[in-house]
Amino acid sequence: MKLLSEIKGDKIVETIEKLVKIPSPTGFTGKVKDFLVKNAEKKGISYTVTKKGAVIYSFGPKDVPGMFFAAHVDALGAIVTDVDDDENRVKITTVGGYPALYIIGEICTIHTRKGKEYVSTFIPNNPAVHVNSKLKEMVPDFENCSLRVDLTLKKGEKLSDFISVGDFVSLDCGFRYVDGYVNSRHLDDKASAGIFVYLSDIIKKNESKLKSRISFFFNVTEETGQGIAATPQGDDLIVVDMGVVGGGTAGSEKCVSICAKDSSGPYNYDLTTELINLAEKNKIAYKTDVFPFYGSDGSALLRSCSDTRVALIGQGVDASHGYERTHVEGLTATASLILAYIFG
């Protein structure tokens, strides 16, 4: 398909970099919502915003059922559970699923409800190796580790004067782009969302060719299990989320994964087969895979027994929910499969 030659991988990466640098732990997604809205208004893209703050880009004839594509822009993060004024430390609880081990030494930002931001580092409570001989034996958890806040307190001030229980915490993304590899936190799922934003320009320029409506849904509650409960009447759903790379899976960072089954059960056979055939027809690098411990935006829709076909695809991502990595070839393959489905 000629249109696929217009896809530029480096431009996708540029968009992803912008997204991963916007703090958006689930429940604190206003800034990324604003980014998506401003982009739509600048490009003349029709959009709506849900009560929860999700953003939907719409293309093509609105009265002809088509395809609903979904990715999520909420990310892993944390919430403050305790402010220790004696030790000047802040304890946190996770937003989303990850072990404490995955954020040891991580630069974090505390976002207060008064609009202030404070930089901190997640480290063991007694972190000096020269005084704590048990550090080598320690298994990190959220009791023996906490946030060390970079805030100079004046006489009479307490840490709890500035930071409160319930404040949100975002994790620094640590973005790097080296030799085709994209290293960053939050590639799950801002890599897919970045593809949506990038492809929106191509689709907008070719909107007159669309024979049915196409929607890009940017969800903001996926990491806490709140997926999509419904789609517009008659639309099917293709979820675009990270493909798993690791032991026991077939995924590759340089391919698009087409998932046959995850923890929710099998995805729609006909729609999944259609995507596989499109990948082969257009010579798109892909892997058919099964994800053993995985849920997506489509999981809620499947459990609701909706009469909707659901499929799942996405670029392979290594070290999921940690310091993740994908490759520009996998991103391009995913973008190509989406575009091939829309215009194929």
Regions found by a protein language model. Name each.
Residues 1-344:
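N-terminal hydrophobic/helix-forming segments and targeting peptides
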